[in-house]
Curated annotation (Swiss-Prot):
GO molecular function terms attached to this record: ATP binding; ATP hydrolysis activity; peptidase activity; proteasome-activating activity
Domain of life: Bacteria
Name the record gives this protein: ATP-dependent protease ATPase subunit HslU
Entry function: ATPase subunit of a proteasome-like degradation complex; this subunit has chaperone activity. The binding of ATP and its subsequent hydrolysis by HslU are essential for unfolding of protein substrates subsequently hydrolyzed by HslV. HslU recognizes the N-terminal part of its protein substrates and unfolds these before they are guided to HslV for hydrolysis.
PANTHER family noted in UniProt: ATP-DEPENDENT CLP PROTEASE ATP-BINDING SUBUNIT CLPX-LIKE, MITOCHONDRIAL-RELATED, ATP-DEPENDENT PROTEASE ATPASE SUBUNIT HSLU
Family the entry assigns: Belongs to the ClpX chaperone family. HslU subfamily.
Keywords (A to Z) from UniProt: ATP-binding, Chaperone, Cytoplasm, Nucleotide-binding
Localization, UniProt: Cytoplasm
Residues holding ATP: 19, 61-66, 268, 333, 405
A GO-annotated cellular component: HslUV protease complex
InterPro entries: AAA+_ATPase, ATP-dep_Clp_protease_ClpX, ATPase_AAA_core, Clp_ATPase_C, HslU, P-loop_NTPase
The keyword Metal-binding is assigned to this record: no
Native species: Francisella philomiragia subsp. philomiragia (strain ATCC 25017 / CCUG 19701 / FSC 153 / O#319-036)
Length: 455
């Protein structure tokens, strides 16, 4: 998708879901477009051009994670979001940073497998229908004499075959139209391998995964006759037939290439592994993790169960609130490998108003759609929308600034009664006004002690 998307187009797509933060949008748009530019270069130059990694700096709830999430859908590339705080220095109990790349490869393999299945879905559907039809209408066999010759003339056998084919086509149409969905049949299907838990030493997750795969593969060829509805059988058999049609080795090779050339890693909470200024002493979860991240970000080779992965051209986007620590508290080597700095701004009342109204699936649109399932027509006056934004901003200022996430808290509290009573309401048309908001929320906002716990 990024091959035909210019930076402006990428920013426009992001603006459909994220309000403001244009600097961050531009930075990721350029980084994404540079992927395509690099692929247009000759081989020698292509190897030299490495991605410019990004550091996003901004308070919680301003859109850092959302930009990454939307970018993943847009990029059509292997993408993984991880929290830096989940990892420990090599040698200590916990996950080591190389598991990031292993998880990224797993994501890529799943993506490529789904792509391959989509390509063979029509053929798999026909083969699945054939297997169902074989159960419904078993193929007729020519009656044989004791010496092994067919008793009936060739013309009769031919007409019987044609009649059988016509019957099969009639039933095939019925299956396709869903007329036989609830009919139960007995069909032989592959048995899903049992999941076997393997306890492994810390830092040896890759070996543990390989052992699990080995045990699973030992029972992968087993078959079992099951009784199920045709609707369920079609889905199960279609997946089986699709798996037979795709080339697993080709999928693995393409997944490895996709990770090396197009992989994106989003490292959240990077500020939590900074060593705070003026402190001293050993800290397992901090500086050691940064030093372990260095080789990945700079470019190294990581062993995975699918093969070796070079991380030279994987794009790393790090983000953090940096409330306590500062970007300069990162070790100098890691700072140098995150050359693009983007600062995301705190949200104002106007931003909250836009977040409530403008995105394709804005918060207000979500609540209106949810209530519609109960037959309730929910609407909001313009003044009421601004009031919600003002209350959210005020609580952020007075209690704790959690950014746009505060809107969800306020909306849940505001619509709690309506949501609870929705199935039994006689008046199915509800208009939210400033008076209604004042009635439900003003007391809580004024009482700081209450708002700390409720909003």
């Amino acid at each position: 998708m990024t091959q035909v998307m210019t930076p402006k187009t990428i920013v426009h797509e992001l603006e459909r879901h994220i309000i403001g933060q244009n600097d961050a949008k531009k930075a990721v748009a350029i980084a994404l477009r540079n992927r395509w530019r690099r692929m247009q270069l000759d081989d020698e130059m292509r190897q030299e051009v490495t991605p410019k990694n990004i550091l996003m700096i901004g308070p919680t709830g301003v859109g850092k994670t959302e930009i990454a999430r939307r970018l993943a859908k847009l990029a059509d590339a292997p993408f993984i979001k991880v929290e830096a705080t989940k990892f420990t220095e090599v040698g200590y109990v916990g996950k080591d940073v190389e598991s990031i790349i292993r998880d990224l490869v797993e994501t890529a393999v799943k993506m490529k497998r789904e792509e391959a299945k989509q390509k063979v879905t029509e053929k798999a559907a026909i083969l699945a229908e054939d297997r169902i039809l074989d159960v419904l209408i078993p193929p007729a066999r020519a009656s044989e004499s004791k010496v092994g010759f067919a008793n009936e003339p060739a013309e009769d056998a031919q007409s019987k075959k044609e009649k059988e084919n016509k019957t099969r086509e009639i039933f095939r149409k019925k299956i396709q139209n869903g007329e036989l969905n609830d009919k139960e049949i007995e069909i032989e299907v592959s048995v899903a391998p049992k999941s076997i838990g393997v306890m492994g030493p810390p830092g040896m997750e890759d070996m543990t995964n390989q052992l699990q795969d080995l045990f699973s593969s030992l029972s992968s060829d087993k078959k079992k006759t099951k009784k199920m509805r045709i609707k369920d059988a079609i889905k199960l058999v279609k997946d089986e037939e699709a798996a037979k049609l795709i080339n697993e080795e080709d999928i693995k090779a393409r997944a490895l290439e996709s990770v090396e050339q197009n992989g994106i890693v989003f490292l959240d909470e990077i500020d939590k592994v900074c060593k705070k200024s003026g402190t001293s002493g050993a800290d397992v979860s901090r500086e050691g993790v940064q030093r372990d991240l260095l080789p990945l970000v700079e470019g190294s080779t990581v062993s995975t169960k699918y093969g070796m992965i070079k991380t030279d051209h994987i794009l790393f986007i790090a983000s953090g609130a940096f409330h306590v620590a500062k970007p300069s508290d990162l070790i100098p080597e890691l700072q140098g490998r995150l050359p693009i700095r983007v600062e995301l701004k705190s949200l104002e009342i106007e931003d909250f108003v836009r977040i409530l109204k403008e995105p394709d699936c804005s918060i207000l649109k979500q609540y209106i759609a949810l209530m519609k399932t109960e037959g309730v027509e929910l609407s909001f006056e313009e003044d009421a929308i601004r009031k919600i934004a003002e209350i959210s901003f005020q609580v952020n200022e007075e209690v704790e600034n959690i950014g746009a996430r505060r809107l969800h808290t306020v909306m849940e509290r505001l619509l709690e009664e309506i949501s609870f009573d929705a199935p039994d309401l006689e008046n199915k048309s509800i208009n939210i006004t400033t008076d209604y908001i004042n009635e439900k929320l003003s007391g809580l906002v004024k009482n700081k002690n209450l708002s700390q716990y409720i909003l």
